[in-house]
A protein has these predicted regions:
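C-terminal beta-sandwich/jelly-roll accessory domains of carbohydrate-active enzymes
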Residues: 141-168
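Loop/helix patches that line or flank the sugar-binding groove of alpha-linked glycan CAZymes
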Residues: 1-135, 141-146
Length: 168
């Protein structure tokens, strides 16, 4: 699911977002600019009804939801992702399985977290280290590929969401 873009401040329920909207107005922003600013940080993004399927209210309720359903619910929903091996849903299933896998659980759950590539734009990367294992986690937040010089050769890719990943 993606963050919802509220079209009006009247669609917002979060008191903190409402307060920030008022602060933005008091600072001289137009109502449109203030709404755009709070849309990026509103906690209501995580509180919208879960998008189960493409039916009314995304299959969440036959009643009236407390917040509006994201407009993209007919395309982005659990039903549309269940059978797609490249979907976010399937990626998270693999991620949860990795966390439960006895070969990695100790490191994933309890390993030390050591940041790396902190100066690389739009990359979040860190090591998870336990006594006998080190995992390197890299997230690229750009829309295009990035090149990183890795500190050592990758022995094994444990989890990846890209069809092609170059490690040379």
């Amino acid at each position: 699911m993606e963050n919802v873009e509220f079209q009006s401040i009247d669609e917002v329920d979060d008191i903190s977002t409402l307060d920030e909207y008022q602060v933005a107005l008091d600072a001289g922003l137009t109502p449109d600019a203030a709404l755009k600013a709070v849309n990026r940080v509103s906690r209501d993004n995580a509180r919208t009804p879960f998008q189960w399927d493409a039916s009314a209210n995304a299959g969440f309720t036959t009643g009236t939801p407390w917040l509006k359903v994201n407009r993209n619910y007919t395309k982005i929903n659990l039903e549309s992702q269940k059978d797609d091996p490249d979907s976010v849903y399937q990626y998270y299933r693999r991620l949860l399985a990795l966390r439960k896998d006895p070969a990695y659980a100790e490191t994933v759950v309890y390993g030390d977290l050591l940041p790396v590539f902190e100066d690389q734009d739009r990359v979040m990367a860190y090591y998870r280290k336990s006594a006998d294992q080190t995992l390197l986690v890299i997230g690229n937040y750009k829309t295009q590929p990035q090149a990183l010089t890795l500190p050592s050769k990758i022995k094994h890719i444990v989890l990846n969401n890209l069809p092609q990943l170059k490690t040379d």
